[in-house]
Design a protein with these regions (language model features):
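ATP-binding glycine-rich loop module of kinase domains
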Residues: 1
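Conserved structural core of kinase catalytic domains
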Residues: 16-53
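Structural motif at the C-terminus of the N-lobe alphaC helix and the adjacent alphaC-beta4 loop
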Residues: 4-15
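Hydrophobic residue at the +6 position relative to the catalytic HRD Asp in the kinase catalytic loop
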Residues: 72-77
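Protein kinase-like catalytic domain
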Residues: 10, 63-64
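Conserved hydrophobic core/spine positions of the Hanks-type protein kinase catalytic domain
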Residues: 58-62
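Polybasic, positively charged surfaces/segments
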Residues: 29-33, 48-55, 66, 80, ...
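C-lobe/activation-segment region of protein kinase-like
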Residues: 64-69, 80-122
Length: 122
């Protein structure tokens, strides 16, 4: 599934780590390592860059018309050299209740929702 999702997201134009190798019989993939803390880790320390939200919204502008959502939880994003990378390859057919505006945005600041999720998933 991740290989299919990678191809979908790559064609849409979502910034992703490069897929380096696939071991289909064992269902393993090797992808480029994007160095740096996740957006979730940075938010917990009080750091939030407006450009990150702008870049997620730009991703949404590509995803929604193509009929897709990604997992907008901030552990899936790493900023590096001015680019916000979506480091998970997962995507799902678009459903408004799971889009960024209705679900993901609640986790993109130091909200009770983010802190509760982080406490439950250390």
């Amino acid at each position: 599934a991740e290989l299919r999702d990678y191809e979908i997201l790559r064609k849409i134009g979502i910034p992703l780590p490069q897929l380096l190798a696939v071991d289909a019989p064992h269902e393993r993939i090797l992808k480029e390592y994007i160095d740096g803390p996740t957006v979730a880790a940075l938010i917990k320390t009080g750091r939030m860059e407006p450009a990150w939200l702008e870049q997620v919204q730009a991703m949404c502008a590509l995803l929604y018309p193509a009929g897709w959502n990604i997992d907008y939880y901030p552990t899936n994003f790493v900023p590096q050299n001015g680019t916000l990378y979506y480091i998970d390859y997962e995507c799902n057919p678009y459903q408004p209740e799971w889009d960024f505006e209705h679900w993901g945005v609640q986790y993109w600041s130091k909200t009770d929702a983010l802190l509760a999720y982080a406490a439950a998933h250390p």
